[in-house]
């Protein structure tokens, strides 16, 4: 598949999903639940950084990983969200979220060329913690289905943004572009250390 076409498609997906946030504020009930779910991943720097890093990681791996890695994150995140909604406790949620930024930022910074299965397993592991946090923090008045749809779409949009950014820079076939992507990973990893240490 043409890299430039794929990059534009990913970027357009992110922008296409964004208006859903505005329209979600036009009502209450199920729609209000969607709004809460959509804004939850966008309201925390930890979630935003990790989601974008997943997209950048997928862009660096190329091939099938471009869609399998983000898809595996979203799929496992849904399972984590169900655990959170059910009130089933899992340990070290906040630590897991913080470490996800450090690790995912690190693999982007070092341009780690992992196998597709290993990459899916890595992002899937951290997806449990992010999903759990989304589910556990759902407002009591919100519809579980609408809320879940909201945070799934927001997460997918952030993945698409990272993927599109990575592919657009890679499409320039520039060493500077690749270095910039790796620099973004390094910045995210440093921010993740701040999250884990409680400084951010």
PLM-predicted stretches and their roles:
Residues 2-200:
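Membrane metalloprotein/metal-transporter helix-bundle signature
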């Amino acid at each position: 598949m043409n890299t430039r076409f794929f990059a534009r498609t990913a970027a357009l997906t992110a922008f296409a999903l964004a208006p859903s946030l505005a329209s979600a504020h036009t009502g209450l009930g199920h729609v209000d639940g969607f709004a809460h779910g959509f804004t939850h991943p966008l309201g925390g720097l930890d979630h935003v950084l990790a989601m974008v890093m997943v997209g950048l990681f997928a862009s660096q791996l190329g091939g099938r990983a471009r869609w399998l890695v983000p898809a595996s994150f979203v799929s496992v995140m849904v399972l984590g969200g169900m655990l959170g909604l059910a009130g089933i406790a899992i340990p070290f949620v906040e630590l897991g979220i913080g470490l996800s930024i450090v690790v995912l930022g690190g693999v982007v910074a070092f341009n780690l060329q992992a196998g597709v299965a290993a990459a899916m397993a890595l992002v899937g592991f951290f997806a449990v913690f992010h999903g759990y946090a989304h589910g556990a923090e759902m407002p009591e008045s919100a519809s579980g289905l609408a809320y879940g749809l909201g945070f799934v779409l927001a997460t997918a949009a952030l993945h698409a943004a990272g993927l599109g950014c990575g592919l657009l820079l890679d499409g320039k076939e520039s060493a500077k572009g690749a270095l910039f992507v790796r620099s973004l990973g390094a910045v995210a990893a440093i921010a993740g250390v701040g999250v884990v240490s409680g400084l951010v």
